[in-house]
Design a protein with these regions (language model features):
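Conserved class I S-adenosyl-L-methionine
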Residues: 76-86
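A short glycine-rich, Lys/Arg-flanked "PGG" loop and its adjoining helix->strand segment in the class I
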Residues: 155-172
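Short alpha-helix
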Residues: 198-212
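Core SAM-dependent methyltransferase catalytic element
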Residues: 224-240
Length: 240
């Protein structure tokens, strides 16, 4: 009897995805025939079929693409700053949506997909903590900012980035309740299950926006949950 493995692991081992993040994006986009959960335990000998290549280097791209479409946000020609770039899902999505240039900033290193690292439109800022960001480190003043960070709240991550933005900036940021709520509101496994807690977290972010020199244009829930199952919300901001 063959051993079982996670579906996303098998997809990478078979060469059907470049990374587990990309494998998860494929499954969540419905592109792996017969499967709907990336964590499904699958027979090692099972036949797997990917019906279409992924659009983006990671599932983050699918998240951002949905938000752009849902909110009618245009980024063509924009100079962008992607805070918390990681593998580069947001960066990839921005470029495919017509962004002129993107700074991919992340506190880690070596994570950005080689395709993006080699793209002349992308400036890579690694080992860069956004809280310590100096505007002179950026090759331009961003007109559009995205933010997807973990283990830090938006109140700490966003203001330093906005301080470097051009006049009339806009931002589309991902609110992750598990990193915004207090420890008492985060359940087992780091998941916020109570919708009232999520609503309170979102209200807190909206209430803080004026202090960042911003006003909220719209919000939308991401149809793709976080890796542990957390519901996440995009907030669309503009300069006050």
């Amino acid at each position: 009897m063959s051993a079982k493995k996670r579906l996303d692991v098998l997809l990478v081992e078979r060469g059907l995805a470049e990374s587990r993040s990309q494998a998860q994006a494929l499954v969540l986009a419905g592109l792996v025939k017969g499967f709907s959960k990336a964590g499904a335990q699958v027979d090692d000998a099972a036949e797997l079929e990917v019906t279409q290549a992924p659009r983006f280097v990671s599932r983050g791209g699918e998240k951002l693409a949905h938000a752009l479409d849902e909110l009618g946000v245009e980024v063509a020609g924009e100079d962008c700053l992607d805070v918390g770039a990681s593998t580069g899902g947001f960066t990839d999505c921005l470029l495919q949506a017509g962004a002129a240039r993107v700074v991919a900033l992340d506190v880690g290193h070596g994570q950005l997909h080689p395709k993006l690292r080699a793209d002349p439109r992308v400036t890579v800022l690694e080992r860069a903590n956004v809280r310590d960001l100096r505007c002179e480190e950026l090759p331009f003043q961003p007109t559009f900012i995205t933010c997807d960070v973990s283990f830090i709240g938006l109140a700490k991550a966003l203001p330093p980035a906005l301080a470097c933005a051009a006049a009339g900036w806009r931002a589309l940021v991902l609110v992750k309740p598990q990193f915004e709520a207090g420890p008492a509101d985060v359940g087992k496994g780091g998941v916020v299950r109570d919708p009232e807690v999520r609503s309170r977290v979102l209200a807190d972010v909206v209430a803080q926006a004026p202090g960042w020199g911003a006003h909220v244009l719209a919000t939308t829930e991401s149809p793709l949950r976080g890796p542990k199952g957390n519901v996440e919300i995009f907030v669309y901001l503009a300069e006050s």
